[in-house]
Each structure stands twice: as C-alpha cells, then as structure tokens.
C-alpha cells in the first residue's frame, strides 16, 4: 500500500480553499449576459470555446493533490446541479465558493464548524420555502421563450425555437438537439410514434420516387415472436385481403418462406403488406410492443399469454390512419387506440420514470412517454465552423433543460434578484446560538454572490448595484445586458425556480462538508526509479555498442 500524505486543521483547509477558488474563478467569468468565454485546450483538434460552467469545471485538474480535492468537490456541485436541473451550474459553483470562503474565515476565527453548518442548512431550508412562494407558473409560449433565451446566453432565436418545439410536441414530448448541416437553426417535428426499424425487404416499397412504404388506414399485426412458417399467417392474411386494407406486420423477426410469401403477395397486389422488426431488445421490446398495441387499439400476439398466430382475428389487429416506413424508421400516425387506455399507459410510464434509478432507463422511458403523448422534435443547430457548432449545441441543450425545469416548477425573477429578495425576507432568522447565527449570515451573504458577479462581469461596481437592488421591492433588479434598472419579469429576465433551488441546495450541501473538514489524506508522490537506472554506466544494452 502506498504511503500517504496527511494534513490537518488550518493547513488542510487553506490548501482545499485554494483549489476551490481556482475552479470557481475559472467558471464564474462565464456568468450573465456579458460573461466572458473560456477557451479549453484539447489533446487533438481545435480548442473548444464555451460559456457553459459545467464544461469548464469538468476540464480542471490541479497538480497539487490537496488543492485538487477542493476543486473536485466544487466540480461535484456543478455536476449535481446539472443533473438535477440541466442548468445553473455557474450559479451553484459561485454560491459554493462564497459559502466556503466565508465559512472558513469563521472557522479560523474560532467558531464551531458543526454549528456553522447547522446555521447554513437552516438558512437554506427557509430560503427554499421562500423561493416556492415567489415562484410563478410558466405555461405560456412567451415565458418559455424568455427562459430559453436567457439560458442560451441571450440568443432569442434559440428561445423561440424551443418554445415552438414545446408547443408542437407538448411539455412531455422528446426534444433532441443535433448538429445541423447549414448555417441556420432548424426545427423538425415528427408527429405520431416513430421507432428505429425500417422495412425488412426493399420489395415492399410502394413510393419508388422517395424510396418509402406508405400504408393508408392499415391493419397492424404485432407479434412477440419470430415468424418463419407462412401457414401460421394464412388465416389472418386471407381476412385482411378480404377487407381490402393494407397490413403492417411488426414482429421479433420475419424470415424464410414467410417473408418470401409476403413479398410475392405484395408485388402481385393480392394484399398490400409491409413488415418491420419490433423496436428494442428483451423486456424493453415487450414494453414497446405493448405501447404500440395500446396506441393502435390492438393486441400483442404473445406465446407467453398462450395466444397463437393461426387463431388471431381482425379484432386482434391494431389500426392507424397512416404508416410511413423508410430504410431506417417506421412512423405510425393517428393510432385508433382508446384515449383513456393511452392516458393510463402514460401515467404508468411516468410512475416508472420516478422509480427508475439509472439515467439510461430514465432516458428510454422518457422516449416512450413522448412517443405515446405527442411526438418528437429535433432542433438542428446551424453554425459556420465546428468550434462554433459545439459551443452553440451546448448552449441550446442548456436552454432546453432550463425551459423544462421552468415548466415543471415555475419561474422567479432572474439576474440574481430572486436570491437577494429571499435573503431579505429571511434576514431575521435566528439559530440556537451565536455560531449558528454566523452560519445563517454566511448563507445570506452568499445569496448576493450571483448578482455581484453578473454586475462585475458587465464592468460595473457590484456594491453600488447590489445596494440599489436591495432598496427596491418585488422583481426590481438590474438588467446587465442594457445597463438599466426595472422589473425583471417585464424585461423578460427569468430563471427557472428548480434551477435556482437546486443550485442553492447542492452548493450548501458540499460547502457544509468542506467547512467541517479537519483532515485531508492523499497518496505521496512516487519517486521516479527510471531516472536512477538511466544514469548507470551500462545503461541497459549500452555494452553492446561494438556489435553495430
């Protein structure tokens, strides 16, 4: 086991604080409408330029191991805020830096660290309650546009595109961000349920000019099994042929004579048919087939439920207004499933999302939810260069997370004003002793830090502006973009309540742990033995010089 380097008390805390400040100082220059860019060097390719706090934080590793521990703990604040609300990483980092700096000053002055932490926690709990009272629901398109614009660093085009996407696919709809091919940002909306499976044979194509299969008012057969024997399918094929409607078959796989028979029937015009594989794998495939059956009002033919394909009738089949199948995707539009069945399935998936533990599971469940409830929107980001594209894509993703958070928990006045107002409302809060009171004051002072930094980044004097904002009431604040005072809601400067709340809670949580740190342990650097061996006279194969 490697030998350890151990530091105690003030010596440990000073080192840790130095690391906190290096990381936070790098992150906080990006805050606000006049925040600066940070250039990140890459081991290959062009450097990337960003104004995203968490992207800056992730890049920072310090040489001194004790300082690095401090930096990594603040990085954790940014990551947690990002995971919870998708935005507010810079605010969270700044709040943590302020609490740690003020808290460690108090510890150095002889205060009890545990009481300081209790005071900070008490202030944060009260502040979160006050934030909830200040919060205003965010439901209309204008408010969503404003939130998106602020989070995308005052890019109005991005804000309005996100609002348009949410309007089209609903608040639960999936909105993905992709790199576009042109200079302009574009919005593409896919209505209905789409999954990543294309036709099993190009002979099914009935629109050769576009290379797709289009079926109008088709029956949809869903089978959770491989189909290779054509005899199983004959009864249902005959029933569909009599009805005169087309047929879509979605199964685990379709091969051999079954596929050949379908192709021949389709080409001869006996029955208009197309076949695709079921989406997903394992249990997820079963769940997605069930989703499709509920959406289209049919049943999944499953051997687990003792159902046989030969005995299935037209009543077991789903129906839709239209199905479009390309080489890679299948889109079912206008399923005829019962509304209440679809709603109860949506509620069930929502419940599963709350209980899911892994991010991957949550993402897949959200996709299923969106496909059932509205559709999928794709935001294609346009830019002139690859460097700009990456920077812009990160901003658009931030803005998207922020608008989702705003719809979920509402909005408060932006520009750091909400936290200043909250601090004013709980200024009379008291702890059980003087050390706890100091902890409360540390938290209250930290709540001014975002406003001060926004002002500082815009080149004004933080103390003057902060005092002016404190003297105002309600949503009165400072618009750093235009250098004027007024109502922040009227200015369209809004922050999602969830983002502000998460930033404060995670910052206080990690900062509290750092204030109560008394000892730090890390590995001692290993001595490099290779330098000793290289100085030996023989130097490895050096004695073989005469062999050349």
From Swiss-Prot:
ATP binds at residues 30-33, 51, 87-91, 415, 479-481, 495. GO terms for cellular component: cytoplasm. Its EC number is 5.6.1.7. It is an enzyme of class 5 (isomerase). The keyword Cell division does not apply. It catalyses: ATP + H2O + a folded polypeptide = ADP + phosphate + an unfolded polypeptide. PROSITE patterns: CHAPERONINS_CPN60. Keywords: ATP-binding, Chaperone, Cytoplasm, Isomerase, Nucleotide-binding. One of its GO terms (molecular function) is unfolded protein binding. The keyword Chaperone applies. It is found in: Cytoplasm. CDD domains: GroEL. It holds the Pfam family Cpn60_TCP1. Residues 524-548 are annotated as: Disordered. Its main location: cytoplasm. Residues 539-548 have a biased composition (Gly residues). It comes from the Bacteria. One of its GO terms (biological process) is protein refolding. Belongs to the chaperonin (HSP60) family. Forms a cylinder of 14 subunits composed of two heptameric rings stacked back-to-back. Interacts with the co-chaperonin GroES. This is Chaperonin GroEL. The lineage of its organism: Bacteria, Pseudomonadati, Pseudomonadota, Gammaproteobacteria, Enterobacterales.
